[in-house]
Amino acid sequence: MSLRFYNTLSQQVEEFTPLHDNVVRMYTCGPTVYNYVHIGNLRTFTFQDILRRWLRARGYQLDHVMNITDVEDKIIRNAKAANQTIQEYTAIYTKAFLEDIATLRLERPERIVLATEHIADMVSAVQKLEERGFTYVSDGSVYYRISNFPSYGKLSHNDFSGIRAGARVDVDEYDKADARDFVLWKAQKDGEPGWDSPIGKGRPGWHIECSAMAMKYLGETLDIHTGGVDLTFPHHENEIAQSEAITGKPFVRYWLHAEHLSIDAQKMSKSAGNFYTLRDLLGMGYAPEAIRYLLASVPYRKKLSFAFDGLKAAATSIDRLRNYKLRLKTDKFPDGANTALSERTRAAASAFDAALDDDLNTAEALASVFEYIRDTNTAMDAGGFPAGNVPAALEFLNRFDSVFDVLKPATRTDGLADTEVNALIAERTAAKKARNFTRSDEIRAELAAQGVILEDTKEGVRWKRS
C-alpha cells in the first residue's frame, strides 16, 4: 500500500511521491523563542518526529530544515523587560527548546537555522519581490501587495477578494478578519534592533523569514511543509504568496498541519494562560516517554484533549508494552515454531504499516500492536507460543518502537527513579528465574553504574544508593 497524506492545499488525501527520487525535502516551522514551549507546541513537533521516522522506515532519505524565530515582536518586548539583548534572551529559550526535544526523544532535523543568521537572505528575497512588483513602501517599511497575487487564500481556502487595497498590518500574527497587506521589512523604531540593508535599516517580518530560509536550503519547491494548524493563516498563506511570487513555481507540494491540543475544551496557548510546559509535567513526576506516548497516540489531524488521566493511561500502556517485551526475553518457551502464530505476526506488522501509511494513523497503529499483544499473551499463557516465534515478535515490537520510541526508560541526570530501579530489579529476577544469568549480570552492572547496590537476601532483593 502506498504512503498517503492529507494535503491542506488540496483538502484531499494524496499518494506521496517526492519530487526527486527518494530524497524528501521537508521544512518545519520551529518555535518563536520568547518563552518555554508548551506541550501544545510539542504535540506538533512530536507529529513531525513520527513523520520523519516513518518516512525513513519507508526507505526515504531526509533533508529536513527547521527554523528558530529569534527576532519578532514578543521577543523584543520580553527582552527589553528582562533588560537583556535579544541575543542573550533568545539563547536561554533556544537552549531550553533543544533540551525539551531531546527529552522527548524527538530527532533533530538535519538543519536547525536561526532567523538572525539569515538576514541577508531575507533582504535578498524582499528585493526580488520589489523587482517583480509585489511590494510598496510606507513609512519606511516594505509591504507585500496581496492584490497582485490572485491566488492568495488558496491554502486556507478563504476568499480575500474583498480586501481593501492598501490596507496594511504591521504585526506578525493576525486572523483572517484582519487580512491586509503584510509587512516584509519593518523600519527600525527607537529601542528596537535593526540591520543595515539596501532596503533601509530595519528587521524582517516573520513570514519572509521562513520563505527565505526554506528556499535557501531546500530549493524553490519543497516536498513537505509541516506546522501547527494555527499557522495555516496567515503565516503559511503568506509564505506561499512570497515564495511563488519570487519563483513562479509551486512552493510546497504537500502541506501537513497538526491540530490543536486542548485543555478544558479550549486551545492550549500562552495567551490564554491554560498551558503546561514539559518541565511542568516532569516536575509533577510524569515520565517523558509517557508524555511522548500521549502526544503521539492521537492522529495528528485530530484534536487532542489533554488530561492527567490520559498521561496515567499512557504510562500504563507503556508498562504493558515493556512487560510484554520482558516476557519475550525471559520466559521459557517450548521448542518449535507455530505457523499460525507466524502468520499472526505478519498480519500485525502489515496492519501496523498500513495504519501509518494511511496519513500517519497512530491510533490504528497502536491498536494493531495491543491486539497482537493480547492474542500472543493468551497463547503464552496456554503454553502454545513456541520459541521459534519469539524473534519475529521481538522484531515487530522493535519496528513499533523505532517509530514511537517509548520502551526504553528515560535516563535521569540525577540517577534512576525508584520506580525505574524496581522495574530493573523485577527484570533481573525474571531473568534469573529463566536462567538467563548473562542478562541478570548486565542489569546488576547497569544499576551499579547508576549508583544502585543490590543485595540478594532470603526475603528478596534489597537495594540502596551508594
Regions found by a protein language model. Give the residues of each.
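Structural preference for alpha-helix termini/caps and helix-kink/transition segments
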Residues: N274-S466
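The substrate-binding groove and active-site-proximal loops of carbohydrate-active enzymes
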Residues: K80-I86, E110-T116, G228
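Short, glycine/charge-rich beta-strand/loop segments that flank catalytic centers
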Residues: I68-D73, T94-F97, E107-M122, G140-F149
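Alpha-helical recognition segments enriched in aromatics with Gly/Pro capping
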Residues: M1-Y34, F45, D49, E99, ...
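N-terminal, positively charged nucleic-acid-binding surface of large information/translation enzymes
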Residues: S10-E15, L19-R105, E459-W463
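Short, well-structured beta-strand/strand-turn elements
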Residues: D63, G133-D139, I453-E455
